[in-house]
Amino acid sequence: MIQSRLMLGEGIVEPMLALARCSKQQRIIVAGSNSAQLMFELHRQGYLRVVTTRHSGLPHGQSDVALVDWRGHSIKALETTLDWLVHFLSPTGVLVIWVDPQDRASNRKLCSILETHDLLVEAGTVRERGSAISARRHELNPISRVA
C-alpha cells in the first residue's frame, strides 16, 4: 500500500481532481498503467463511484469523468487509448490526462490528438514531475434552448 501511495503521492491526484471539478457523487473511470492504484487512492478520499477501464462494466456514455495517468507512455500510444476511452464519457463528461514533462511539440501533438477525438482543451496545469490537461467534448451542432 505504501508503494502504491508513493507512486501516486507525487502530487497528481489533487491537480487532476481540481481540473475535473468533479464531486464525490459523479461516476469516474480511470485508465493508465497505475489505474488500480489511482482508483484505490480516490476510494480512500471518498470517491466511491470510481472504476478502472478493465473492471468498469458501464455502458458507453455513463462516466462523468475520465482520469488518465499517462506517465511513462508515448503521446502516440495515447491516441489508441482515446479511440475507445472517449466512448465511456457522457456527453458533458470531462477527460483529464496526466503526462510526463514534455516539450512544446509534444504538447501540440497532445492537443491535436484531443481535437481529432472532438475534445476541446479547457485547462491545464504544469508541475515539476509532469502536467495535466482537461478537455470536454466539442459540440459541433449545439442544441438551441427554447425558454
Which residue stretches match the model-derived regions?
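Core SAM-dependent methyltransferase catalytic element
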Residues: 112, 117-147
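Structural motif
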Residues: 30-35, 52-55, 68-73, 98-102
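A short glycine-rich, Lys/Arg-flanked "PGG" loop and its adjoining helix->strand segment in the class I
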Residues: 77-94, 111
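A short, well-structured beta->alpha microelement
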Residues: 15-16, 34, 39-61
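A short acidic, Gly/Pro-enriched loop at the edge of an enzyme's catalytic core
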Residues: 55-76, 80-83
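Class I SAM-dependent methyltransferase Rossmann-like catalytic core
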Residues: 1-25
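Conserved class I S-adenosyl-L-methionine
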Residues: 97-120
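Class I SAM-dependent methyltransferase "Motif I" SAM/SAH-binding loop
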Residues: 7-11, 29-36
